[in-house]
Regions:
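A short helix->beta-strand "capping" segment at the edge of beta-propeller domains
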Residues: 2-28, 56
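A short beta-strand motif characteristic of beta-propeller blades
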Residues: 18-24, 58-63, 98-103, 138-144, ...
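Beta-strand-rich domains and repeat architectures in extracellular enzymes and scaffolds
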Residues: 21-48
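Residue-level detector of Asp-centered blade-edge/turn motifs that repeat once per structural unit
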Residues: 36-38, 76-77, 116-117, 156-158, ...
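Hydrophobic beta-strand positions that form the internal "hydrophobic ladder"
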Residues: 41, 81-82, 121, 161-162, ...
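Loop/turn residues immediately N-terminal
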Residues: 47-50, 87-90, 127-130, 159, ...
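Blade-level signature of beta-propeller repeat domains, shared across WD40, Kelch, NHL, RCC1
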Residues: 266-300
Length: 300
């Protein structure tokens, strides 16, 4: 990123971050993940390329040719990830970006997630069913919800997953599909993020702000920000939250929702991933640029 391209960072309010690194994919962004344990950033673009970047934004592994790539999820350990190819195929990749297996689920896939260790994979389907597969491609759990799910995350330390529909439902299920709770959620939802233990849940609630829930689905209030939040990500332990808005706002908050820094971005944000310690975050723009911003050194 050139000095002129970094200039937008200086237009913010509050304590500005340091630009740590930037990377530009070959095509518009499809997905972005931060492996919280390994520190790798995984990027997928519309040309079918998948990149693994190290902690300094350098390419470690690159794979091309996954045509019709539409979504990406990755384990915290960095060992395995999953992509959606076409509408209905779930494909699992290893750290070398070699294909491990594929499964045609015969329904459009709305959302995917990988557990922190790369052992289990969740796929939320168009018809309202969610399937959980293990690393040998066996379906070990499934459940159906009244509204089709659009965002899903595995909980670290518990064999559970938390998910939400675009509107109307926030829920938690065990790995075998057993429902633990489900709560109505009447705002439109742009994104879902959870702390590592699932004790804090945040929804980018668009016109209703950033909504916070506890691990049992009880409302803990709303973080009010300027604009319409559509992307959100939290640190592993709850100390920082980053959000973006439809109006191209980018906002860095503390655990109580106090705004520490805010800026207008030069283009639309597709994905945000907060550093597990809350030192900073990775921001993926729709056009293909990925930027790492930090307050203090994120690594030695």
């Amino acid at each position: 990123m050139t000095e002129s391209e970094q200039r937008w960072l200086d237009q913010g309010r509050g304590l500005s971050p340091e630009w740590t690194w930037s990377f530009t994919a070959d095509a518009p962004l499809v997905g972005l993940e931060l492996a919280r344990e390994s520190g790798d950033t995984i990027v997928a673009d519309a040309s079918g390329s998948v990149y693994i970047l190290d902690r300094r934004g350098r390419i470690v592994t690159l794979s091309r040719g996954l045509h019709e790539l539409v979504d990406l999820a990755w384990s915290d350990s960095g060992t395995h990830g999953a992509v959606v190819v076409g509408e209905t195929t779930l494909a699992v990749l290893n750290r070398q970006l070699r294909l491990v297996w594929t499964s045609d689920l015969r329904e459009p896939i709305r959302a995917i997630a990988v557990d922190p260790y790369g052992h289990h994979f969740a796929a939320c389907l168009e018809g309202g069913e969610t399937r959980i597969l293990n690393n040998t491609r066996k379906t070990i759990g499934r459940f159906k919800t009244t509204r089709r799910l659009s965002h899903v995350r595995f909980v670290t330390g518990h064999a559970d997953l938390i998910a939400t529909a675009d509107n109307g439902l926030l829920c938690r299920h065990h790995l075998d599909g057993t429902p633990l709770w489900g709560e109505p959620c009447w705002s439109n939802i742009g994104d879902l993020t959870i702390t590592g233990d699932g004790g804090a849940i945040f929804l980018a609630g668009l016109n209703l702000g950033i909504q916070r829930f506890d691990g049992n689905g009880n409302s803990q209030g709303t973080y009010v920000v300027e604009g319409t939040p559509n992307r959100v990500s939290t640190s592993y332990a709850l100390n920082r939250v980053v959000a973006s808005t439809v109006e191209r706002g980018l906002i860095w908050l503390d655990s109580d929702g106090e705004i520490l820094w805010a800026v207008e971005t030069p283009e639309e944000v597709l994905t945000l991933r907060c550093d597990p310690l809350g030192a900073g975050f990775v921001c993926g723009f729709e056009g293909g640029r990925v930027v790492r911003l930090d307050w203090g050194a994120p690594f030695p």
